[in-house]
Amino acid sequence: YLQTKKKKNEFEKLLLASAGPYLEQGERAAAEMKASSYEKLRQRADEEGAVCHGEFSQHNILLENGRGETAVNFDKWNFDLQVADLGYFMRKILEKHGWSERAAERILNAYSARRPLDEGEIETLRLYLSYPWKYWKLANRYYGSRKSWISGRNTEKLKTLNAQQADWLRFVKGSFF
């Protein structure tokens, strides 16, 4: 649709111009996930009844003065690998910190101190972080929306995402994991 559209707005031009690297990385991550131990891990998680928050970010964690932490807003809970919540959390934090390997290491060390990850979970986390979730979300929202009006906020999000692309790809292809 977008390629044949004659008059494109700024968002559409940006979306189309930036699609290549995100599609390539998404296909690579999906193929690697399919070839990984993800399905075995997921089956094990199903048998154990593992529950995920579904939207585990810093906004959904309450720190209670010396009494610990509380997770809130379980609207998107689901049955899945718990490492999916860690991946979501890390992605949100790393986007705000330039995909810093140091920040990733600190998060992973803190998590592992309470719940160590096995090799398959670490590989799943790496693949989760290498998928272009934010680009997919913006493209999917565009595809499912009225095309006559595009939110300026989405255009800004796409510009920010494209500006962070090199840092993200460096992190994904780097030696962190």
Predicted feature locations:
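Short acidic/histidine-centered micro-motifs embedded in hydrophobic/aromatic stretches
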Residues: E39, L127-Y128
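Helix N-cap / loop-to-helix initiation motif
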Residues: L117-E121
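Active-site activation/catalytic loop segments of kinase-like enzymes and analogous catalytic loops
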Residues: V83-P116, L129-K147
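Active-site acidic catalytic loop and adjacent metal/ATP-binding pocket
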Residues: E32-Q82
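ATP-dependent phospho-/nucleotidyl transfer catalytic cores
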Residues: Y1-V51
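ATP/Mg2+ or Mg2+-diphosphate-binding catalytic cores
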Residues: Y135-F177
